[in-house]
Structure formats: C-alpha cells, structure tokens
C-alpha cells in the first residue's frame, strides 16, 4: 500500500490534555545520571516453583552433613556420653531423616490444599502427624 501524507484535522471533542504534576515534570526534565539499570526481579512464586522442580529432580542430601552430624551427637549425648559414630551410620540417619521430612511435607501440603490454601501452616503438620498416628 502506498504511503500518503497525513493532513492536520480539526479536533472534534475528546479529552483535553491533563496538566503534569510538578514531580512528574521534574523527573522528566532531570537527566539520568550514570544510567543505573534496575536489577531484574522475577514475579513472586516463580523462583519458588523453579526450586521445587530442581529439588524434586535431585536425589542428593539437602541438609549439610556437618550440622546434621553435630545435631546427632548432641541428641545422642542425652542418652549416653562418649558415643562414637561410623560415618556410614550418620549418613544412614541423615537419609532416613530427610526421607521422613519429605514425606511429612508432602502430607502437610495435601492438608493445606484440602483447607483451600497454598501456604502450609503448623496446624497442617499437626494434622498430618495425627492422621499418620504419630501424635495423639
């Protein structure tokens, strides 16, 4: 289609241009110094969903080994002093603990969804444990 020259037309009503606020006008007239770019941010929930997919794919342990080992030793001291642990024993305990927690959080999430919520709460954990028969 061939280009045609635009001719000025008389306005027939419509909205009158609004006056700019003083701050908006000052912002437009002031030159930008340095051109600092705002860092990119994902929408709320996007990173959480990405992390969920990442951790569901992986099979490695999520709790750090040394803090878990310290916790095991601290709990064991309540029962008997000077206990020694093989490294494989601590790893087996960690595998079992993480498997238990993952299962508990899955059930907790189902309890939250049943209550028409997406956020898990302590009452969901309590309900999941009660249904499992772990806590009366």
UniProtKB/Swiss-Prot annotation:
Q: Which family does it belong to?
A: Belongs to the histone H3 family.
Task: Give me the ranges of the annotated region Disordered.
Answer: 1-43
Q: How does it assemble?
A: The nucleosome is a histone octamer containing two molecules each of H2A, H2B, H3 and H4 assembled in one H3-H4 heterotetramer and two H2A-H2B heterodimers. The octamer wraps approximately 147 bp of DNA.
Record GO cellular component, one term: nucleus
The record, for PANTHER family, names:
HISTONE H3 (PTHR11426)
Listed InterPro entries: Histone-fold, Histone_H2A/H2B/H3, Histone_H3/CENP-A
The protein's organism comes out as: Lilium longiflorum
Which keywords label this protein?
A: Acetylation, Chromosome, DNA-binding, Methylation, Nucleosome core, Nucleus, Phosphoprotein
Tell me one Pfam family matched here.
Answer: Histone
PTM-bearing positions, type N6-acetyllysine: 10, 15, 19, 24
List residues, modification Phosphothreonine. Answer: 12
Taxonomy of origin reads:
Eukaryota, Viridiplantae, Streptophyta, Embryophyta, Tracheophyta
Q: Could you tell me which residues carry Phosphoserine?
A: 11, 29
Question: Hey, what tissues is this thing expressed in?
Answer: Pollen specific.
- What does this chain do? Variant histone H3 which replaces conventional H3 in a wide range of nucleosomes in active genes. Constitutes the predominant form of histone H3 in non-dividing cells and is incorporated into chromatin independently of DNA synthesis. Deposited at sites of nucleosomal displacement throughout transcribed genes, suggesting that it represents an epigenetic imprint of transcriptionally active chromatin. Nucleosomes wrap and compact DNA into chromatin, limiting DNA accessibility to the cellular machineries which require DNA as a template.
Q: What is this protein called?
A: Histone H3.3a
């Amino acid at each position: 289609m061939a280009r045609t020259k635009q001719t000025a037309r008389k306005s027939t009503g419509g909205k009158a241009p609004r006056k700019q606020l003083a701050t908006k006008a000052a912002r437009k007239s002031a030159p930008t110094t340095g051109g600092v770019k705002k860092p990119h941010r994902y929408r709320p929930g996007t990173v959480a969903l990405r992390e969920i997919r990442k951790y569901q794919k992986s099979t490695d342990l999520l709790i750090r080994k040394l803090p878990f080992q310290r916790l095991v030793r601290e709990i064991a001291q309540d029962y008997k002093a000077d206990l020694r642990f093989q490294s494989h024993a601590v790893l087996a305990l960690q595998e079992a603990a993480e498997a238990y927690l993952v299962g508990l959080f899955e059930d907790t999430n189902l309890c939250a969804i049943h209550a028409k919520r997406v956020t898990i709460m302590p009452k969901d954990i309590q309900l999941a444990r009660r249904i499992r028969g772990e806590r009366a």
